[in-house]
A protein has these predicted regions:
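Sec-dependent bacterial lipoprotein signal peptides
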Residues: 1-15
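An acidic-aromatic pocket/loop used at catalytic or ligand-binding sites
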Residues: 17-133
């Protein structure tokens, strides 16, 4: 193998190792997108994902969808979020849409399959000039 080929392979490997959107960036963007929100007490994080525009946090709780959704409706109102819409479907899923200073927040709460509890998803937008105070 020539030196040039080895150099190209090393550079390609180094570039491939530095991936944008690593865990640190995901946490930073999720923190920005979900700033001012609250997680239900005793929840466990399932996953977090984020891009430049939005972030999603999936959590699990041992409590029922009814209990968790009522808590969120109270907590959002107490923390200056305006609940715009709440929908429930026949499967027990509850969807809540709220805004705080033009910033949207979507919550989807689903009953766990095969056991008690709730899995909920929080989706927020990374603030821009139009969504900041």
């Amino acid at each position: 193998m020539s030196r040039a080929t080895a150099l190209v392979l090393i550079c390609a490997a180094l570039i491939g190792c530095e991936r944008p959107g690593g865990p640190e960036q995901t946490r930073r963007l999720a923190g920005q997108a979900l700033q001012g929100t609250l997680a239900y007490p005793r929840s466990t994080m399932v996953s977090v994902s984020a891009g430049e525009e939005a972030a999603q946090l999936v959590m699990s709780s041992p409590d029922s969808v009814t209990v968790v959704s009522k808590w969120f409706l109270r907590a959002l109102a107490m923390n200056n979020w305006e609940v715009k819409r709440t929908l429930s479907d026949a499967n027990g899923t509850v969807t809540i849409y709220a805004e705080q200073h033009k910033r949207p927040l979507w919550l989807t709460l689903r009953p766990n399959v095969g056991g008690p509890g709730t899995t909920y998803t929080m989706i927020g937008v990374v603030p821009t000039d139009s969504t900041k105070k």
